[in-house]
Swiss-Prot record:
Belongs to the TRAFAC class myosin-kinesin ATPase superfamily. Kinesin family. MCAK/KIF2 subfamily. GO terms for cellular component: centrosome; cytoplasm; kinesin complex; microtubule; spindle; spindle pole. This is Kinesin-like protein KIF2A. Keywords: ATP-binding, Cell cycle, Cell division, Coiled coil, Cytoplasm, Cytoskeleton, Developmental protein, Differentiation, Microtubule, Mitosis, Motor protein, Neurogenesis, Nucleotide-binding, Phosphoprotein. Plus end-directed microtubule-dependent motor required for normal brain development. May regulate microtubule dynamics during axonal growth. Required for normal progression through mitosis. Required for normal congress of chromosomes at the metaphase plate. Required for normal spindle dynamics during mitosis. Promotes spindle turnover. Implicated in formation of bipolar mitotic spindles. Has microtubule depolymerization activity. SUPFAM superfamilies: P-loop containing nucleoside triphosphate hydrolases (SSF52540). GO terms for biological process: cell differentiation; cell division; microtubule-based movement; mitotic spindle organization; nervous system development. Residues 223-553 form the Kinesin motor domain. One of its GO terms (molecular function) is ATP hydrolysis activity. Pfam families: KIF2A-like_1st (PF22923), Kinesin (PF00225).
Length: 706
């Protein structure tokens, strides 16, 4: 008899349930609990499977057509009510969506009709009528019951009335949504070559429960924060009828609808889901992005900390727009970028009583890193040298720090720096940044460093794949970007796990930002910007995978079974690496070797050899240029000495022995210095040849570039 209490509830059917927050949606019955007369249900929400145990009374109040018959056993002629069919809103990683089924709407209408049948309290009357009078041809059991007994004697309870009202509202809402979908379908351009994919994406989105991020959502504290920002389709993509394949249904979920094709040429969608700290859709302005990302880091620098904010993504995905400000044609409104918004909050915090008494001074620097070289954007792109002193502190020699008193001073510096930043035209963007731009806000107290906020607009990550280009300059650009992004990931790994060693020497970018990854009071935020177009799908997935790996590094190591820990090597292991990779040892090369070994899936031995050849070539280039500058300065002194010797020969009784001795000394010095310079130039030319040969040995089937 206990099983009869469950009525028509069976394992596997979908029932309406009410959540603690008042929401009503459908869930699947997974078990029937006879001991306490309850059922266990499960549903999928935001990619996670959730479940709860609900008593039968609550189930029957929302699903009256599933309630058991009262007192009188149903006759064999009484047909059971069909279980309602429904769809469940899902966000499932790797879900496939095949071409849309055209008869979806009638199925839904049938379910609506079945739920509107007679109330379960009338079922005993139907059964009794059938037993006494038999089945009347053309008259349903419900009609026969009404004819025999008249209207039911039981009155509807308030709960049932409320449920019926909710059901009526739900059906009206579904009809409105169906009408809206049909209207959108009429607006779709059927001439679009990707019309089928467009319909699949539209139908998939129609079943999602959208809850985007709003300014009312709380701001969580993260030592490492990773978020994603989607930009809208631009004019070029719209004219080419490109499709928007990115969906952001909630505040922390990003979905990519990747078009695929089967062997039989059937097209389908591979829906891939990623989760981050925050996800911003195309409607989110810069102010909202700043509020959840860089703004929580401002207070860190007032507490003697180091804060870093990166903008990462492919060319044209909106990095410079996010960091520098809104674009109107080629003109940029710097007042709406994260640079200026962070500066505004810095000056506001300076006025707080607890910080005002510190008498802090604010300075700003702006430089770029291009092909492994550092240039000062506030000093006519003067080339700078990056050195490490005896205290293992990295110094950028010659970098200008400008004192700023207000936000307007910061805006002027940003405009000066942006005007001379290295850029070029690419297929993705007519004004593409090809360098890492680093804007730093520095707090000093009595001349000593108090805190530093580094805001970095990274170069396009797709340039990291250009390591096999025929053009050397493009190869160097790609190699430096590829290496710096790998090093950046490993430095964030070390920061998130509080590891003692950080491979910051592996690239110029991480070397300059060394103090941002060292120390307990360091915080980092990464804003991954993505393009929504189907043509950019591969680069978008690479960006999301990179950002996802960075975020995975911040979780508890005990819960991260598939994440490889930081590998610390003994001197003997370093020697083994030397044998494996075939290179010598230096702090820079050791970090590069460890970096490549920890990313074996992305860096093949041939690619590592190329990176090592590029690093060696860049080092030799700096030495040759520095020695050439020294020879030039010595040449000026030699000219003065030789001029004095020639003037001495004009005298009648000059000392011939002294003249010959001094001239020989000058010539010997010239020969020694010039010979040394010539040998270095020969070695440099050999390094250029090695770099070119190494670029040709890179396996074209190597793993994708980050």
């Amino acid at each position: 008899m206990a099983a009869a209490n469950f009525g028509k509830i069976q394992i596997g059917i979908y029932v309406e349930i009410k959540r603690s927050d008042g929401r009503i949606h459908q869930a699947m019955v997974t078990s029937l609990n006879e001991d306490n007369e309850s059922v266990t249900v499960e549903w999928i929400e935001n990619g996670d499977t959730k479940g709860k145990e609900i008593d039968l009374e609550s189930i029957f109040s929302l699903n009256p057509d599933l309630a058991p018959d009262e007192d009188i056993e149903p006759s064999p002629e009484t047909q059971p009510l069909p279980a309602p069919s429904a769809k469940v809103n899902k966000i499932v990683k790797g879900r496939r969506t095949v071409a849309p089924v055209k008869n979806d709407t009638p199925a839904r209408d049938n379910r609506v009709a079945s739920s509107a049948r007679a109330r379960p309290t009338q079922l005993p009357e139907q059964s009794s009528s059938s037993q006494q009078n038999g089945t009347v041809s053309g008259i349903s059991p419900v009609q026969a019951a009404k004819k025999e007994f008249g209207p039911p004697s039981r009155r509807k309870s308030n709960c049932v009335k409320e449920v019926e009202k909710l059901q009526e509202k739900r059906e009206k809402r579904r009809l409105q949504q169906q009408e809206l979908r049909e209207k959108r379908a009429q607006d779709v351009d059927a001439t679009n070559p990707n019309y089928e994919i467009m319909c699949m994406i539209r139908d998939f989105r129609g079943n999602l429960d959208y809850r985007p991020l709003t300014t009312a959502d709380p701001i969580d504290e993260h030592r490492i924060c990773v978020c994603v920002r989607k930009r809208p389709l631009n004019r070029k993509e719209t004219l080419m009828k490109d499709l928007d394949v990115i969906t952001i249904p909630s505040k922390d979920v990003v979905m990519v609808h990747e078009p695929k094709q089967k062997v039989d040429l059937t097209r389908y969608l591979e829906n891939q889901t990623f989760r981050f700290d925050y996800a911003f859709d195309e409607t989110a302005p810069n102010e909202m992005v700043y509020r959840f990302t860089a703004r929580p880091l401002v207070e860190t620098i007032f507490e003697r900390g180091m804060a870093t904010c990166f903008a990462y993504g492919q060319t044209g995905s909106g990095k410079t727009h996010t960091m520098g400000g809104d674009f109107s044609g080629k003109n940029q409104d710097c007042s709406k970028g994260i640079y200026a918004l962070a500066a505004r909050d810095v000056f506001l915090m300076l006025k707080k009583p607890n910080y005002k008494k510190l008498e802090l001074q604010v300075y700003a620097t702006f430089f770029e890193i291009y092909s492994g070289k550092v240039f000062d954007l506030l000093n006519r792109k003067t080339k700078l040298r990056v050195l490490e002193d005896g205290k293992q502190q990295v110094q950028v020699v010659g970098l200008q720090e400008r004192e700023v008193k207000c936000v307007e001073d910061v805006l002027k510096l940003i405009e000066i720096g942006n005007s001379c930043r290295t850029s070029g035209q690419t297929s993705a963007n007519a004004h593409s940044s090809r360098s890492h731009a680093v804007f730093q806000i520095i707090l000093r107290r009595k001349g000593k460093l108090h805190g530093k906020f580094s805001l970095i607009d990274l170069a396009g990550n797709e340039r990291g794949a250009d390591t096999s280009s025929a053009d050397r300059q493009t190869r160097l650009e790609g190699a430096e970007i590829n290496k710096s992004l790998l090093a950046l990931k490993e430095c964030i790994r070390a920061l998130g796990r509080n590891k003692p060693h950080t491979p910051f020497r592996a690239s110029k970018l991480t070397q300059v930002l060394r103090d941002s990854f060292i120390g307990e009071n360091s915080r980092t935020c990464m804003i991954a910007t993505i393009s929504p177009g189907m043509a950019s799908c591969e680069n978008t997935l690479n960006t999301l995978r990179y950002a996802n790996r960075v975020k995975e590094l911040t979780i508890d190591p005990s819960a991260a079974g598939d994440i490889r820990p930081i590998i610390h090597h003994t001197p003997s292991q370093i020697d083994d690496l030397d044998t494996q990779w075939g290179v010598g040892s230096s702090p820079q090369r050791d970090d590069l070797k460890l970096l490549c070994e920890q990313n074996e899936e992305e860096v093949s031995p041939q690619l590592f050899t190329f990176h090592e050849a590029v690093s060696q070539m860049v080092e030799m280039e700096e030495q040759v240029v520095e020695d050439h500058r020294t020879v030039f300065q010595e040449s000026i002194r030699w000219l003065e000495d030789e001029k004095a010797l020639l003037e001495m020969t004009e005298e009648v009784d000059y000392d011939v022995d002294s003249y010959a001795t001094q001239l020989e000394a000058i010539l010997d010095q010239k020969i020694d210095i010039l010979t040394e310079l010539r040998d270095k130039v020969k070695s440099f030319r050999a390094a250029l040849q090695e770099e070119e040969q190494a670029s040709k040995q890179i396996n074209p089937k190597r793993p994708r570039a980050v």
